[in-house]
Amino acid sequence: MPIAVPLPGMRVLLPFLLLPALLNAQSDIAEARTYAIGSVVTITGIVTNGPELGSIRYLQDGTAGIAVFPGSSSVPGFAPASGQEVQVTGPLKLFNGLLEIDPVMGFQVLSSNNPLPAPQLLTPNELGEDVEGMLVRVNGCQFTGGGTFPSGTSTFSSIGQNAPIYLWNGHSLVGDPVPGGLVDLIGICSQYDTGNPPVGGYQVLPRGSGDLVPSTTINLTSGVEQQAITPDGFTLSWSTNLAGSSEVAWGPTPALGSFAGSGTPAIAHSVALTGLGPAAFVHARAFSVLGSDTAWGERTLYSTASAVPGWVRVVFNREVDTSVSQGTPAVSALGSIADSIAAYIDLAQSTLDVAVYNTSNYTIVGAVNDALARGVQVRWIAEGANANFALSALNNGVPVLYRTNSPGSGMHNKFVVIDADDPANAHVLSGSTNFTQGNLFDDPNNLVIVRDQALALAYTLEFEEMWGGTGPQPVPANSRFGEDKTDNTPHRFQVGGTLVESFFSPSDGTTHAIREHLDVAQSSIELALFILTENTLRDALLEAHADGVWVRGVVDDANAPGSDFFTLTSAGIDLYDHSAFPELLHHKYAILDHSDPGGDPLVITGSHNWTFSANTVNDENTLIIHDPAVADQFFQEWTARRDAFTGVAEVGGKGPIATWPVPFHEGLQVTADDGIVEVRLLDTTGRIVLAEAGQGPTIQLRTAHLAGGGYVLEVRERSGRTLRSNVVKAP
């Protein structure tokens, strides 16, 4: 029986033969969105776009929105106009994260020229599943880059937050000038995320130039930045497009209730909150008022500095190269890092919280048992999918909570909190190492120790969110892991003279925070990563490299599924594949501008691998340490890892080789004492890119055709010895 398709002014008649599949009751869109993929639903809504977005349509009622795509097997003729009220029937489908009805099994146009739903006013960070398929509005948006709109994805920012818009090839905005000033952006919240499961990729789809409204109201033109952190208080600073008041609502709870600031009009705003006390957590929201308009910042939890000035120390479990030190030699605890961890646990006098992915070391477990014996309250969280066989040696008085609903790597944290309530003895142990024999003794890892009460209290908040309460025993019914967690901790801490940032995954947008720092690197980025599959961070590295930043690193496995290794090396970035070594390179760190006096030397480290799952489903902890001494120590560790590939190494004996110039460009002169039989240049993946036979002690290589970057020089001498050295070609 043929499908009846509406002529202008007519409605679709659903054929009798389809009725058995369509007898499910009419649903509002919010209810329909809860049904299983593949369920046939019937919904009614107002169409919020026309052909400007292609053949897809978005429908919205008073409860939610949804996409409708007339894919293969759809009835013909589905092309309703914006403002029409339409009833649609079809199965639910998930397309790269976007929930849609596809195919269209039947539809009726019920009415036309209806007013569109009012857009939901939100911030970039509030784009998400709750508003997918709905009209949204983000005020005070600035587009980056200038020029004209390209097809594909572009980025906009508002109140210091970033989000994408997407324009398909046939969109009317493609080729139009990008607004130079602030605009209020209107569009439909959509999603494009190829991950499994898809949890990100939310974007705004403007429908035309009318969705870019010049902003005539006061808006924030920057994020709210916490500065001047002291034990007594801190200052919040921000800027607006128009002159308005400088005010902050604040309080000990999210209800706020107290106010500070000035009504004097200004564009650059600064409000000091004082009298708060040391290691105090305060909820605050900055805002500026101009007439009847108010520009709001986000409500955020902030911390004052601790009463006792703290410090940051770093210990590595493998060799370091102190010859490159610019001040403080790095500490290598070869074979004894478990003893170092146990020694800090021995400091605990009142409380000890442990959240570690996997444990097989009895020295550490013994130190925890000793802490319990001297009256310390001990709590432990671990990943339930792991063996954790050393936990069988824990005293029965130590409660252990396992995360058992674990996609990805699950409870992947590696941290210990000691005496968080003691201003003089509060410590946090973090870094990349699990408490396993392999991680502690073989696999290159780092241990970061921070003595600071405010940071310890923040880590305790995170621990107790997973623990399910504040008591000595876990409350599994209340515990939150993974995507159920909230962004409930401060992020900036003044530890002595060092600024330390703290982020927990997946609630805190850790990948975004890492990218923000990569985007402002001035001169150098060194990486030591277990895995690199996160495309957002890949793109940041590519952009930094294109901007002249020297990007180089070591990655444990270049061939891991989804690896970005070869994308980066093909762009000229110096990366080394560690997979040939028997141990795992387990680090997750980046060093930025370690020797740049005009930059901000910092280190990003913790449990957070540079992967999609680390940012979206795993429990992770990350520290960003702004300190030139710490950056210098990590660079000493990184140099030792790099030297495993590129330092002068020799097979079958010893003997020096010399190269000139450094770096080389059109040519490279190589000299070896015992005479050269053959010289080879290998790129960072081990591929031979140049080979020359030699007869004397010196050989000239022609290298103009080679790409700039790092190479391994391999020299075979007459004696039979083979020497290797790192060489660099100038860009």
Regions picked out by a protein language model, each given a short descriptive name:
Residues 305-378, 385-398, 419-663, 672-677, ...:
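Charged, low-complexity intrinsically disordered terminal segments
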Residues 1, 7, 15-19, 249, ...:
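C-terminal outer-membrane/trafficking sorting elements
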Residues 27-29, 214-222, 643-666, 731:
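Residue-level detector of functionally pivotal "anchor" positions at catalytic/ligand-binding pockets or at interdomain
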Residues 179, 273-281, 703-709:
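Surface-exposed, short loops/turns at beta-strand junctions within beta-sandwich domains
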Residues 26-217, 293, 381:
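OB-fold single-stranded nucleic acid-binding module
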Residues 41, 232-236, 664-668:
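Structural beta-strand segments of beta-rich domains
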Residues 215-306:
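Short, surface-exposed linear motifs at loops/turns and structural transition points
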